[in-house]
């Protein structure tokens, strides 16, 4: 196949949630935020609430990320045109990445040698200068490695990373670290370690030597979850002589420790008395003596405190000098669903929480981490549900604070199993093993509504379920927006868009074109949906429902029931919703349940007229591998198609709805003829069953312009087939072998007259390729030619297996016949949207 270089690709959108682990998020001096999304390292811009890229390299789930420099050292990054990012995974691998701030290009610099044998739990760093840094990494096997890194001063140079020391603490895991330079002792550092033994271990060492244990700090009564050193504290003295360490624990308590320079070793030993040790441990580093003592104990959180972080330094005048001043301000994040900002009172010096923000949703399950922005005007939290929460201080006065929630990127926090477009492309719908169904759409910006001004956001969360969701299909045809979903259960569930969603859709880029007019909206009597605490069904909230009296459940006293769950408040949204709204107020009501399958659902599809839905389930026998046909509207079973002996992995109707194609784990595909009689009954007939591949067939797709289709398989091949006039199935083309198992395929039409189209191929490696395919029909039969159109760059593709590809319906491309939109989903928790110019 020759390569056609005329196809231009643009990545439009990435939706992903954060891995549910502590230390996973880092806010860099560049203003960008990094986090782990399965085995990808994702980077997003808080200003636009858009994920900019994902970095491929890790094979295991990413546990932690850390910028060099972070927001704490933003004052040392003003002149840097390159910044760096560290990421560690559950296999113990640490990778160093480079960002060119001039053109926003990313580069894989190196994978650290001698990485950990078990999962990396934490990475911390200290910027010695603009071109030098130290960092430490901890592992669940109790080993802490200390590294020295030198950044290149010239573009032609490379980073130099040296392992200074490897500290074997004990068999218990170390889960948090913090690194700081000792006051008035250049080149000597303090390293604080926290883990599962409730103690803070303090080590001291040089950039060129080993680190030795100097003392232990006791006080916490449960696991230490977070540690953070402050920068040197400026006082009336010219040179600061103290730093602070803040620690948090599962005992719900935050402790502040003060590390003070006592003096040089000789003078201190002359003055040593028993009283010298009352305030706290004393240790020697080099020629200086230090003492560390408890400064304050902060009690306010009601659950485990997972994260504490000092506010980044601010430029301030102290004694007529312009210095980077360390504010006495701490941000804490807890599993009690709150973040707090702690500061000492000016008069008494007593530490109090001056700001408290958090989640009010009953669906919320607490925060794993909290982070300051470089300018300290924003704070970011990430939680158990993989979601981000961003607050910004919008107050114009320095005397008061007004923290308001801001837009953030969102997405699934587990593998995304299926994705589909709305019937005319207004939005896309994805389902995941995180047990949610999500709607993504482009929102209009203030600048305009052209493609360049579109920002994609999560529009709604129609289904929040109790089982992993495997498949989804939009019901095509006229009428309200409807979809069917199948999960790790035997029931197909049908959902219908409520009025609140239809009105919200008018504010999106695509929905404003009147895809569901006002006069049709008047027929929709359901405003939204409620979710019961102990059930899986989502009950409708009617537009004019009468509220029942509170006494229906004994005044609300007694045992908890489904009636104690707060009522959802669905409403028209004029801007992208925040997490609290998405989690509970954007549900779609469930209208029907379809019973029949004997095992968990695996695949669904709808015909293009909106008359039929086909479904399949997991199967190890021919009786279980039946394909069920359901009539839209009555939702009755109108057919049970038998052909396969193992799980049917994918289903698709031809574009004229006369044929149904199925592919299976049994390495066969089947083509069924679907006909409607004059009285509306559905008849079906097996036309052909062909053993098409040597391994499991994962996906199939029809040519929009004819009865040709593509199949993709674990045998790394994609084959093109044609249904001939005499009902024979003929293989007309085999694309050259791919680099890994082909898990997804999708065909879009480009030119009906020339019968040309484009086949998108998604692989287990995460890569995506496009091939131009042209169908040639003659009297002798059908043939086809193909040419490689484009191989997407790895930085644009998924980092794990691609599970589904879907082209946007071509009705949305009529204004620009050369533009096509493709969405994809994968095991890296990501939903992606691309556009291609042919």
Curated annotation (Swiss-Prot):
Tissue specificity annotation: Expressed in leaves, stems, roots, flowers, siliques and guard cells.
The keyword Protease is assigned to this record: no
CC per GO annotation: cytoplasm; elongator holoenzyme complex; nucleus
Protein family according to the UniProt entry: Belongs to the WD repeat ELP2 family.
Compartment(s): Cytoplasm; Nucleus
Name of the protein in its database record: Elongator complex protein 2
Organism whose genome encodes this protein: Arabidopsis thaliana (Mouse-ear cress)
Gene from which this protein is expressed: ELP2
PANTHER family named among the record's database cross-references: ELONGATOR COMPLEX PROTEIN 2 (PTHR44111:SF1)
Source taxonomy: Eukaryota, Viridiplantae, Streptophyta, Embryophyta, Tracheophyta
Repeat positions for WD: 17-56, 57-107, 115-157, 174-213, 219-267, 300-352, 361-401, 411-450, 464-505, 596-640, 643-682, 692-731, 737-781, 797-835
Pfam families: WD40
Domain of life assignment: Eukaryota
